Amino acid sequence: MKTCVAAVCGMFMLLVSCSGSREFKPAFNQPLQPVMQPGFVYVDQVAPLVKTNLKYAGYDNFVGRPLDGYHGRRAILRTQAAQALKKVSEDLYRQGYLLGIYDAYRPHTAVLDICKWGADEGDQKMKSRYYPHIDKAKVFGDHYVRDFSEHSRGVAVDVSLLYARTGKPVDMGGHHDLLDPSSATDSTLVTPSQRRNRMIL
């Protein structure tokens, strides 16, 4: 099975995302009303300081369209993961930051949709923004994407930082879903300031 590299932040399994300076807006505005399984919660009900912008519910992602299974803008996690996220968000707020979520629970249908996209070599419309320095065939082979995700268990999130005062993204030297060596947390391809920002997470 093919696997990908995920940056995991401590016990909370926070997948670090490198956010650029684009404004943090919800990707999709239709309310999400899934059948909530026992042990899962909406993140905004537990951690109100967390700001959500589900990229896979819209078009600003490496596939270039909403993924199967995403129908709204409310993030879902297992209860314990959401409670851990609440503690992290409160600590960051005291430092002048907000925690922004790009992805949380990911339906398995979305994972299958990503695999389907990966098999279509002709679909290269998002290459210049999301994987400019690698061939699409290596997106899976170089471990950027995998055919199983901890997101589907509701215990992982893609996150970045926002300034609490303005709501603007903190400069991480990249953007969410940038499939590139520079996205590695400790990459030397970004500036020292951008690396310091990453280390906050």
What spans do the regions from the language model cover?
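Positively charged n-region of N-terminal signal peptides that target proteins for export
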Residues: 1-4
